[in-house]
Amino acid sequence: MASSLTHPPPPPHLPSLNPKPNFTRRSLLLTSTATTLSFPSLSSSAIQPPNPTITDRIFMEFSLCPNYYLPNRTLGDTISTLCSDSTLLGRVILGLYGNLVPRTVSNFKSLCISNPNSNPNSSSYKNTLVHKVLPGQYFLAGRQGRPDRGEVRPPSYLPRNTETVDPKAFALTHSRPGIVSLSLSENDDEDEIKFDPEYRNVEFLITTGPGPCPQLDNKNIVFGTVLEGLDVITAIASTPTYQPGERIRQFNDLAEFFGDERAQNARAIWNRPLTTIYISDCGALEVTKPSLTPSLP
């Protein structure tokens, strides 16, 4: 009997795992077009440039007071009572960037238009000190504390400023004299005030020149510029300040190393003007039309 041989079916055809590509100019063009349509690139609309439009104008008048640190002052004396014969240093006009950092500008403006004479419990920059001057860099004002010491009453009623943690708020740089900035890295409010849950930072700095201050960039919020009165800023910057000797600095560094709190208290008077400079008046001015920041030297 003849037996028939059975043959197994042929294996299925498997495509090559690494087929040789067959590219043509047309296929490359179509692939490139499809990729462009499917994955749009980052455009200028995705990353918005800073908007330094001046939406608000503020005036500040700075004065010199010869009597503020007299030894015979009483406990109830304030700048308004001690400095009745002060000398006006000049008026400064500030332009604020309300579109870029609206909350920072709003809080700053609130303390400029507040009137402590009509409401003793309100917070205001009026009758507060320029408490620190760093020659060739900037000066600080708006330190919080006791009004009788020329400090700003803590403004716990202000809205919380969430721009301090918003990267977009740090877009502008301290590139020239006359930059107005919310002091964050240079803030020297006492820890007792900073640790209050209702703490609102209102300390500010103004760069004095002659050069830029790149060490302030990305650490403090630029929210305005000096429009008029740069000569007043220069006069404040030229005021003599208290500078400790090298031996005192070494002792202070050693005390800080060992955690002595008195080291920080001692540094509070470093760079303090030897002549009392204070904000004798401040308020808002009308803005007829928002404008871009002018170029300053």
Regions found by a protein language model. Give the residues of each.
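Cyclophilin-like peptidyl-prolyl cis-trans isomerases
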Residues: 2-297
